[in-house]
Amino acid sequence: MTKRKLACVSAASMMTVAAVLTLTTVQQADAQQRKSLRWTTSQVGTYGYSVAAAMAKIAEQALGGEYTVTVQPYANPTVAMKAVMNGEGEIAYTADVGMTQFHDRTGGFKDYKPTKPEIAHSWYAYPMESMMATTVKNATNMKCWKDFSGKPVFFTPAGFMNWLNFQRIFKALNYDFKHVQLDLKANGDALEAGTIVGSVAYTTSGAQLASYWKETEIRMDVRIVNPCEDEIAKLKAAGLAVVDVDPKGAFSKNVGPSMLKGVPILFGYNARADMPEAVTYKLIKTFYDKRNELVKIDSGFSAMAKDFVGMQVQGINANPQVPVHPGLAKFLKEHKAWNDKWKISASAS
C-alpha cells in the first residue's frame, strides 16, 4: 500500500474514532444530565411490576427526556413504600389498605419512622378484586370462606396488598388467618400437593390476572369459592365492598361460579411529598390524556379510563387523613373535583 493510501486510511480511521468518541461523550453527558426517577414496585411476576415496567417509557416521554425512569422491584409493596420514604426511590407502588396501615402505623409500619418526606396521594391506577381459589377436588368441601378459616392458605406473599386485604376480611368475619408463605412460582405446586387448601387470586378491573396466576391456571383446573350471603352481609357491615366479577373477563377456563365475588382494593403509585409539583402534574396529565391508549397496553386500565378523575377522588377518600400531592391537587382543581377538606402536602418547587 502506498504512503498516500496509508495516510488516507489513517485519516479516515482517526475521523471514525473521533466520531465515536464524540458520540459517546455526548451520550454520557446526556445520561449525566438526566435526573433519576425510581419507581419501587412489588416483585417481578406481579401485576404491579408489569404495569410500572410498561409505564416507564411513557413517563420518560411525559417528562421530555429530562428523567431516566427505572423500575425497582421489592419483596412486597410494604417494603417498596418504605424504600421510597428511606430515599431509595421517588414513587411507590401501594394501595388504599397499605396507605391506611402506613398512616396508622399498624401492621408492617408499626413504629416505622421515615428518613425522608412521606408519600402523598398522587395517582390511582386500577382496582383489584381479591377472591379465594382452591382445587377442583377441594371445592367439594369448600363452600364458603369460613371453610378456609384456620386452614393453610397462601394469601399472596406477606406484605402484599391482597394479603393485607384478606387480613381485614378475616378480621371482619372473625376467622383464623393461617398464612403459608410461598414463592409465587410455587403456587400451583402447593395447591396440587395439598400443602395449602386455598390460594388468594385477584383480578385487575375484572380483566387481568397476575402472571403467576396465569401460569397456575394453565397447568391445572381451579375453582373460585365465593363468600356466602351471611359473609357478604358481615363484610358490608364492616365497610368493605363486595363486587361482581365476570370470570370470562380474566380466566381462560371454567372456575366454577357464573359470577365471582371479590373484595376490591384500589392500587396506585404515590410519590414522595418532596417530588416537584410540576413533575407529578406532568405525569398525571399525560396519563389522563393517554387513558384510552393505556387500555390498549393493558385492559386493567379500563376502569381508570372510564372515570380517571373519579378514581383519584376515590383513592383520596379512602384515606382523607393522608395529604394530597400538590401535583394531583392542581390536576383535580382544574377538573373541578377538589374538596377543600383535603390537605395538600408540602412539596419541592
Spans of model-derived segments:
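Pocket-lining segment of extracytoplasmic ligand-binding domains
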Residues: 96-98, 105-114, 120-121, 137-138, ...
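Bacterial N-terminal signal peptides that target proteins for export
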Residues: 1-15
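An extracytoplasmic/periplasmic, membrane-proximal ligand-sensing/linker region
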Residues: 186, 203-224, 234-236, 278-349
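C-terminal segment of classical bacterial N-terminal signal peptides
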Residues: 17-28
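Extracytoplasmic small-molecule ligand-binding "clamshell" domains
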Residues: 50-86, 255-257, 347
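Ligand-binding clefts/hinges and TM-proximal coupling segments of bilobed small-molecule sensing domains
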Residues: 149-168, 239-309
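Bilobed "Venus flytrap"/periplasmic-binding protein-like clamshell domains
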Residues: 36-63, 67-70, 129-195, 203-207, ...
